[in-house]
C-alpha cells in the first residue's frame, strides 16, 4: 500500500512566504544583525543582502535582480551608485539599459525639409515677446 500523497499546493506555499517573509525582514532584530562576512568581502552572494539592507528605495533593483545579466564594469558601477545614493532610484534604474547603448539615430524629418524650431527671445525689460 502506498501512503497518501501530501503535496502542498504551490499557491499555499507562496502565500505563506508572502505573509511570513516581510515581517521577518522588517523586524528590529533583523535590522540589528551585524553585516555578514560575505558582505564585508564584497562577494557576489551578498547582492540581495545589500539590496535589502542598504539605504534608499530598492524595489526596482530587487524585482530585476534575477533578470539582469552581468554587464560591463561601467554599467555595474553606475548601478551600484544609483542603489547606494539616497532618494527614489526607480527612473534611473529602469532607463539605465537604454542609456548604456549608442546614441539613437537621428529621426528623418517629415516632408521635404525639417521644420525650423522657433527660439523665444527675451524682449527688453526682461519680458518675453509672447
UniProtKB/Swiss-Prot annotation:
Residues cleaved off as propeptide: 97-130
Leucine amide modifications at: 65
Gene Ontology biological process terms in this record: eating behavior; neuropeptide signaling pathway; positive regulation of cold-induced thermogenesis; positive regulation of transmission of nerve impulse; regulation of neurotransmitter secretion; response to starvation; sleep; temperature homeostasis
Keywords recorded for this protein, A-Z: Amidation, Cleavage on pair of basic residues, Cytoplasmic vesicle, Disulfide bond, Endoplasmic reticulum, Neuropeptide, Pyrrolidone carboxylic acid, Signal, Synapse
GN (gene name): HCRT
Xref: Pfam families: Orexin
Main subcellular localisation: endoplasmic reticulum
Keyword Ion transport on entry: no
Residue(s) carrying Pyrrolidone carboxylic acid: 33
Cellular component GO terms held in the UniProt record: cytoplasmic vesicle; perinuclear region of cytoplasm; rough endoplasmic reticulum; synapse
One annotated GO molecular function: neuropeptide hormone activity
Protein name, UniProt field: Hypocretin neuropeptide precursor
Signal sequence coordinates: 1-32
Cellular compartments annotated: Rough endoplasmic reticulum; Cytoplasmic vesicle; Synapse
Family that this chain belongs to: Belongs to the orexin family.
Function text: Neuropeptides that play a significant role in the regulation of food intake and sleep-wakefulness, possibly by coordinating the complex behavioral and physiologic responses of these complementary homeostatic functions. A broader role in the homeostatic regulation of energy metabolism, autonomic function, hormonal balance and the regulation of body fluids, is also suggested.
PTM comment text: Specific enzymatic cleavages at paired basic residues yield the different active peptides.
Residues annotated with Methionine amide modification: 96
S-S bonds: 38-44, 39-46
Amino acid at each position: 500500500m502506498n501512503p497518501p500523497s501530501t503535496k502542498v499546493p504551490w499557491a499555499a506555499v507562496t502565500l505563506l512566504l508572502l505573509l511570513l517573509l516581510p515581517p521577518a525582514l522588517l523586524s528590529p532584530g533583523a535590522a540589528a544583525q551585524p553585516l555578514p562576512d560575505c558582505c564585508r568581502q564584497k562577494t557576489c552572494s551578498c547582492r540581495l543582502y545589500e539590496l535589502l539592507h542598504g539605504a534608499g528605495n530598492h524595489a526596482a533593483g530587487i524585482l530585476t535582480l534575477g533578470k539582469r545579466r552581468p554587464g560591463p564594469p561601467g554599467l555595474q558601477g553606475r548601478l551600484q551608485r544609483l542603489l547606494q545614493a539616497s532618494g527614489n532610484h526607480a527612473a534611473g534604474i529602469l532607463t539605465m539599459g537604454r542609456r548604456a547603448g549608442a546614441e539613437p539615430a537621428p529621426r528623418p524629418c517629415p516632408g521635404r525639409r525639417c521644420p525650423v524650431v522657433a527660439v523665444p527671445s527675451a524682449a527688453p525689460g526682461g519680458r518675453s515677446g509672447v
